[in-house]
A protein has these predicted regions:
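ABC-type ATPase nucleotide-binding domains, specifically the catalytic core motifs of the NBD
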Residues: 14, 52, 77-97, 104-110
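The feature captures the beta-strand-to-loop junction immediately N-terminal to the Walker
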Residues: 17-19
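ABC ATPase signature
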Residues: 75, 120, 133-134
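Helix-to-loop junction immediately C-terminal to a conserved catalytic motif
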Residues: 32
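Conserved ABC transporter NBD signature motif
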Residues: 40-47, 60, 94-99
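A short, proline-enriched helix->beta-strand linker immediately N-terminal to the Walker B motif
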Residues: 135-139
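Catalytic Walker B motif of ABC-type/P-loop ATPase nucleotide-binding domains
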Residues: 141-145
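Conserved ABC ATPase signature
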Residues: 116-120, 124
């Protein structure tokens, strides 16, 4: 990818649109530091992050939900959510409150919290991937093809969840 430049303001919902192979996923991977840019600068909340380690970027509040409903399929829903809180240092009470927040936004996950993630439906796995990202306490949530492979009804539900998350202050 060459010559890309964009700003995302706090509270916005921004969409990258382009053909297959245009570089949308590569751009998200560079922003979240899964790929290292060869040149240029990426900043988040006024801080340069181009050479920052991925876990430190997460601690700053930038979290990505990868394409393809990536969950830890052999772990339970609860264990997947716990991994989202792994880098947090704000204490067990804050993490417990965020479990409840995720379960309130995504009630199916509460019903299935002891279920193995690989046995969930595609829509439930996508909800789990979003829930795991929310456990990181993001300021900005990067979603790579959040509706990929979902039925139209589930697409509407996922987009409603994204809207609710945005309304709560997450960019």
């Amino acid at each position: 990818i060459k010559g890309i430049s964009f700003d995302v303001n706090e509270g916005e919902i921004v969409t990258l649109i382009g053909a297959n192979g245009a570089g949308k996923t590569t751009t998200l991977h560079a922003v979240s530091r899964l790929l290292k840019p060869k040149q240029g600068e990426i900043s988040f909340c006024g801080q340069p992050i181009s050479s920052m380690e991925a876990h430190k970027i997460i601690q700053l509040g930038l979290t990505q939900v990868p394409e393809g409903r990536r969950v830890f399929s052999q772990l339970t829903v609860q264990q997947n959510l716990a991994l989202g809180a792994y880098t947090r240092k704000d204490g067990a009470d804050a993490v417990a409150a965020d479990y409840e927040m995720v379960f309130q936004r995504l009630p199916r996950l509460k019903e299935r919290r002891r279920q193995i993630a690989g046995t969930l439906s595609g829509g439930e796995q996508q909800m789990l991937a979003i829930g795991r990202a929310l456990m990181c306490k993001p300021k900005m949530l990067l979603l790579d093809e959040p509706s990929m492979g979902l039925s139209p009804l589930l697409v509407q539900e996922i987009f409603s969840i994204i809207h609710d998350v945005n309304q709560s202050g997450v960019t």
